[in-house]
A protein has these predicted regions:
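Short Pro-Gly-centered flexible turn/kink motifs
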Residues: 89-106
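Active-site/ligand-binding surface loops and adjacent short beta/alpha elements
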Residues: 1-47
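Glycine-rich active-site loops that engage anionic ligands at enzyme catalytic sites
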Residues: 33-74, 79
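Context-gated lysine
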Residues: 2, 35, 60, 85, ...
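Short alpha-helix capping/helix-loop boundary micro-motifs
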Residues: 81-88
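Sterically constrained small-residue positions within well-ordered secondary structures
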Residues: 23, 46, 57, 90-92
Length: 106
């Protein structure tokens, strides 16, 4: 999914198919706003860069999940060596690998 205007309008049908996945580290921060007032009420700020961002809900669910992803599932039809998988991360033996994000409630 490509973002062009930095806005995604949520609807009851938006998650009928599946999770929305935004790749290529396009997202650093996501906020949910109240439709009626425009007031911010929750968000996620990526402190480190994440390769992908998942946005999902059960169809007609009373919530929206905002998830920074440091990796993700295979693309449909991917049959290559795991080292060729997009978004793959590797830590050397003894190395510590961390990513940080903040959950913001307002």
């Amino acid at each position: 999914m490509k973002l062009t205007d930095h806005t995604l309008v949520l609807s009851d049908q938006l998650f009928d198919v599946d999770t929305l996945v935004v790749d290529d580290a396009q997202i650093r921060e996501v906020w949910l706003r109240r439709k009626a007032t425009g007031q911010l009420y929750a968000g996620v700020r990526c402190i480190d860069e994440f390769c992908s961002f998942g946005i999902w809900s059960l169809p007609k669910g009373p919530y929206v999940c905002l998830e920074p992803w440091a990796g993700r599932c295979d693309d449909e039809g991917f049959c290559e060596d795991i080292s060729q998988k997009p978004g793959i991360n590797q830590a050397e033996p003894g190395e510590c690998w961390k990513k940080q994000y903040a959950i913001l409630i307002g």
